[in-house]
A protein has these predicted regions:
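Amphipathic alpha-helical interface elements
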Residues: 1-162
């Protein structure tokens, strides 16, 4: 998979419909879950096919291998949201979907997301400076961005400590 910059990832998610955004976001999140597993278990790729772990199992393995447990809930909800779209092609993203994902974040991650968005909104003179007042698509995009960033950081920390 091509490594996208943060801006490219944001743009990729922004140009998709609900289905495309959720599926594409999930693919990129799972990519970083796999990268974390490979860094934590250098032989993981050799046995990954035999292990045949689904996304949920991979996220649990990540937590067992040192990924902050604060990400367990949000990562699980990303998988459930992806499954809703995969198994119900006409499914539409709801406010509740996004609210539940946001609520699954730790208080620290919620505050980080709000502060980061506010700073960006001021910097780029966005009309809406409050995360909570954004639409579902915009909030989900930022939630994907946050989770991807947390996984990338955890992956980098594993590599630094190796």
């Amino acid at each position: 998979m091509n490594e996208l910059s943060d801006d490219e990832f944001h743009d990729t998610l922004s140009c998709e419909d609900h289905l495309g955004m959720v599926i594409r976001g999930h693919i990129h999140i799972e990519h970083w879950v796999d990268r974390f597993l490979l860094s934590a278990m250098p032989c993981y790729d050799k046995y990954a096919e035999d292990i045949n772990a689904d996304y949920e199992t991979k996220t649990l393995l990540c937590c067992a291998l040192g990924l902050t447990p604060e990400l367990k809930g949000p990562l699980a909800l990303i998988g459930k949201l992806r499954n809703r779209f995969a198994h119900r092609p006409s499914y539409k993203l709801t406010k509740s979907d996004v609210d539940n994902l946001y609520a699954a974040l730790s208080g620290t991650h919620q505050q980080h997301l709000k502060k980061s968005y506010k700073a960006l909104a001021l910097r780029y003179q966005r009309e809406e400076a409050s995360f909570s007042k954004l639409g579902n698509i915009e909030r989900l995009n930022l939630l994907f961005m946050l989770l991807r960033a947390k996984l990338k950081k955890a992956h980098a920390q594993l590599n630094e400590n190796a």
